[in-house]
Swiss-Prot record:
Belongs to the bacterial ribosomal protein bL20 family. SUPFAM superfamilies: Ribosomal protein L20. The gene is rplT. GO terms for biological process: ribosomal large subunit assembly; translation. GO terms for molecular function: rRNA binding; structural constituent of ribosome. Keywords: Ribonucleoprotein, Ribosomal protein, RNA-binding, rRNA-binding. InterPro entries: Ribosomal_bL20, RIBOSOMAL_L20_CS, Ribosomal_protein_bL20_C. Binds directly to 23S ribosomal RNA and is necessary for the in vitro assembly process of the 50S ribosomal subunit. It is not involved in the protein synthesizing functions of that subunit. This is Large ribosomal subunit protein bL20. One of its GO terms (cellular component) is ribonucleoprotein complex.
């Protein structure tokens, strides 16, 4: 006996179309296009979750470097000075400190300079 996919297909299609909400034009309305775009979107999402970490690290380093140069030291010498001084602050914290608390950052820079 032949089995038709009636409700199963509808459920499967609805699931894909629900996830495609917010896509443009036929990529939201047509099952095949929606499925293809959704697959692509998930690939982008996976890739960009990895890239996000790299991008933020780059941003933090840029901010720290700018703040270091205002205090007459290069980024690399500053990081070397921190490790020699035994100060274990990560780049996220240092970048935040450089942006929001320049006086505290200056004190850290002075300790790093003294350790060199």
């Amino acid at each position: 006996m032949r089995v038709k996919t009636g409700t199963v297909r509808r459920r499967r299609h609805k699931k894909i179309l629900k996830q495609a909400k917010g896509f443009y034009s036929g990529r939201r309305k047509h099952f095949r296009k929606a499925k293809e775009q959704l697959e692509r979107s998930l690939v982008y999402a996976y890739r960009d979750r990895k890239q996000k970490k790299r991008e933020f690290r780059k941003l933090w380093i840029t901010r720290i470097n700018a703040a270091c140069r205002l205090n007459d030291i290069s980024y690399s010498r500053f990081i070397h000075g921190l490790s020699k001084a035994g100060i274990e602050l990560d780049r996220k914290i240092l970048a935040d400190m450089a942006m929001n608390e320049p006086e505290a950052f200056k004190a850290v820079v002075e300790k790093a300079k003294a350790a060199l």
